[in-house]
Amino acid sequence: MRDYEVQPQHVTPEVQAWVRAQAALGHTAPTILKALRKSGWLADVAREVMAETLQAPSGVPVPRPAIGAALRLDAGDRQVDVLMQMSQPHIVVFGNLLSDDECDALMQAARPRLSRSLTVAVKTGGEELNDDRTSRGMFFTRGENELVSRIEARIARLLDWPLENGEGLQVLQYLPGAEYKPHHDYFDPAEPGTASILERGGQRVGTLILYLGEPEAGGATVFPDIGLEVVPQRGHAVFFSYDQPDASTLTLHGGAPVLAGEKWVATKWLREHEFT
């Protein structure tokens, strides 16, 4: 059998012109990315094409951990492992962010306060039930107790983002069958309720999902636009940022259905400015 050498792929003016043409026709960044992958472009090269061709100059500053080539980061009171990172979209998977005792303490404190999870009501700026989200959850106020304060300070140092720009820590419980269908965390400027939401700290620019309890099966955090699934591992976390409220950030994500056992997570959303 003859061995064939795999030819390297490079970003060319021709493929960039094609991407610009597709964007001009109104196709979204996720749709263009999927078309590149379907036509044979490798995932990392396709993302590079998108990043170089559809740069968005209107983006705002976002949390961005100073990782470089480091395998672990100093988060103040804890050394946190860097397990995976990518640049487009900006995603980092952290290990050892929380101890087992901290995971247990958060779940124990949250359990008696759980209720059916709500989502932002985009028409009014309030909250509402949404069939896309079937978890139970609660919010700690920022700095509510020593445990929450300690974890929030660790997150602020790890992500190099002001502590006061974070929303309160949310804890969620997913029972078998529970899920959160793919969505974006930023607030859509086209919705009538967004203006009032932004008064409390501006746009969301980053999300950190911390895994407190592992299910027996299912429950991955999925990023459909880039074909990534992050398996929930106790004490680990996944972080991603988005510099504009647009699908071109490729941060569409969701929580796959839990097939067996329970999944517990804590979510920290980060705003442009101080969250009040």
Regions found by a protein language model. Give the residues of each.
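Fe(II)/2-oxoglutarate oxygenase catalytic core
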Residues: 1-239, 243-276
